[in-house]
Design a protein with these regions (language model features):
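Alpha-helical tetratricopeptide repeat
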Residues: 1-195
Length: 195
């Protein structure tokens, strides 16, 4: 039985944890060992305990951010992206410019196809570390992927609207082929009727 299970095996068990950064750091180190061995569930338990032992003072904000970020790395490895995003966001509330965590959350957003959020995170990273070529290339890749997704969604919507329009206009002996759509420079469309 895992040492953690002794404390949590009974639902009425309440455990008071005294805040201790040395204990928190030791638990994090143990979590790191399990993470390297790919025992993610066990690593999560250690990181969670590290979080509970970490003092809530401002001087320990970075440590808290690291503990949450490390736990998020476990969730990423387990493809539990929503939980990874949640832990990354918590870590960033303690350390807003922690690039490693922003990048981890960016990857999680991309994994669940929330490309707008992924692009926002990579833009934030580039703002923090402007000269990093790797981040600039990643920014370009994600922006391109987002534009492709938006274009595909726009095409799908236009096809659906065209189908609906043809259904309605068909009752009057017309189709959308009688209408010419022209896109203006500002992104809007004008419609011209042709017989």
């Amino acid at each position: 039985m895992d040492e953690f299970d002794l404390f949590t095996s009974h639902p009425a068990c309440i455990r008071v944890v005294e805040k201790d950064i040395k204990q928190a750091s030791a638990l994090k180190a143990k979590g790191n060992e399990y993470y390297k061995q790919k025992f993610f569930d066990t690593a999560i338990k250690y990181y969670t305990r590290a979080i509970s032992y970490c003092p809530l003072t401002k001087e320990h904000s970075y440590s808290r951010a690291v503990f949450y970020s490390n736990r998020a790395a476990c969730y990423m490895s387990m493809t539990e992206y929503d939980r990874a995003i949640e832990d990354c966001s918590t870590a960033l509330s303690f350390e807003p410019t922690y690039v490693k965590t922003i990048l981890r959350r960016c990857k999680a957003y991309e994994a669940i196809d929330q490309l707008e959020d992924a692009v926002a995170d990579i833009d934030r990273i580039v703002d923090i570390d402007k000269g990093n070529r790797t981040f600039l290339m990643e920014q370009h890749r994600l922006q391109t992927k987002l534009k492709e997704k938006q274009e595909a969604m726009k095409k799908e919507m236009m096809d659906k609207l065209k189908g609906l329009g043809n259904t309605i206009l068909g009752k009057f002996g017309m189709s959308l082929d009688n209408f010419k759509f022209n896109q203006k420079d500002d992104g809007t469309y004008s419609v011209n009727f042709q017989q």
